[in-house]
Amino acid sequence: MKASSWRAGPRGRALAVCLVAAFMTGLDVSIVNVALPSIREGLHAMEDGLQWTLSGYALTFGLLLVPAGRLGDARSRRTLFMWGVVLFTLASVACGLAWNMNVLIVSRLLQGMAAGMLNPQVSGLIQQMFRGHERGRAFGALGATIGVSTAAGPLIGGALVTGFGPELGWRWVFLVNLPIGLALLPLAHRVLPTPDPAQLSGRRESMDPVGVLLLGLGVACLLLPFIQQHQWHGQAKWLLVPAALIVLAGFVAWERAYRREPLINLALFRKRSYSLGSAIALFYFAGFTGIFFTFTLYLQSGLDYSPLMAGLSITPFALGAASASVVGGRLVGRAGRRLVAAGLTIVIVGLCATMAATALVPGHDVGLATALPLLIAGVGSGLVISPNQAITLSEVPPAGGGSAAGVLQTGQRLGSSIGIAAVGSIFFSSLPQGWPTAFRHGLLVLLTCVSIALLAAGYDLIRTYRR
């Protein structure tokens, strides 16, 4: 079937609805960054409150991915999708109307829960609706959407804060989701595929509550010390990391013993495409997410850029990621993991060039000097995210697509949280040497993470050629 035929048909319309939802939830990962100074002034917020505005979303997002993916597989992805849209829209309105930091933090936690409900359904629906090269192209479109939403967040947030002013602008950063959510609901009800009753008749077993509890506790213990690194003083917080490993080991033991309907099919990790793809996603997201955090902070706080100008400066990355993701979705069926390795190499080249540009052109012209290097890094990113997701899920049966995607996305969220914490620690500890030096030291951390992802891709290629 020609690509144009399914794009214009029911599956194309359903994919469009899924992509809009993915854009909305991805946008809220980064759009808040440029609004933090306005939130601090408007709600008289302390640093720990601002940190929870960012990290609370990431925490509940990561906690819900696997259980929601499993529930969508077993019940109805369409139903979970629609409930996720409802909750995300209501939580966004609550964020926009928040009268103090406690209300904003709780609303952001709910917003993250809704995003965690939504995103596995998007991947699961793509697994359900598409096969072969069509699936690769659909994941290419999803990768472009994720890349653009994350990279465009600072630009859109900066435009809203600038356009509506510091007092109201930060509220519109959240309220912008209201019209999107209201438009999505009737469209989702109309175009998303309904589950086949015959297919679901034998899939209403237990949802493995013990597995849900163990995985949630393990992920929370692993994430908390990283996202609260600067607010939770002392070294005691790091005791949660070995505690998390013990809990997760208990989760694995339980899943192996639980024969009815385990939360995660551990046999997936015996497939090299899935295990290495998940590792690549974890380390790449640890590297690529931190660039938005450190660069916008450097531009706004170090060089006095306006929120809008800071957002514009990161736009080349978004443009490169969007264009390359579409191409990557078309090529992944032929090039496979070679495409991912090439993309990671291009990202490393782009980040090295960005580091050189900040050294050669210090001062207020940094935004212009880094435009081309960030465009190059964005092109590389577009060849990594969607092709890697398509390859990682290529051997997953459609019936388990939601839970498998939930595990993959949990790794992405975990990588993002660890990466931001690591780069933030190096960045802030280097500030006495100046903003440019702190930014370059932070980039070294990001380059290390991306390089580890490249090693994993290279190992997969070597194993493939030896077969």
Predicted regions and their residues:
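Intrinsic disorder in cytosolic terminal tails and internal cytosolic loops
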Residues: M1-P10, P197-R203, D460-R467
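Transmembrane-helix bundle of Major Facilitator Superfamily
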Residues: M1-R190, M355, S425, S429
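12-transmembrane solute porter fold
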Residues: G12-L27, V32-V34, K237, R260-R467
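Membrane-helix interface/capping residues of multi-pass secondary transporters
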Residues: E47, R77, M101, G132, ...
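Alpha-helical transmembrane segments of multi-pass secondary-active solute transporters
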Residues: L50-Q51, L80, A138, W172-V176, ...
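Cytoplasmic-side transmembrane-helix entry/capping segments in multi-pass membrane proteins
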Residues: W83, R135-V148, R204-G211, R270, ...
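Transmembrane-helix signature of multi-pass solute transporters
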Residues: L87-L97, L110, A114, I180-L187, ...
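Hydrophobic transmembrane-helix bundles of small-molecule transporters
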Residues: T162-A279, Y305, S313, L446-L447
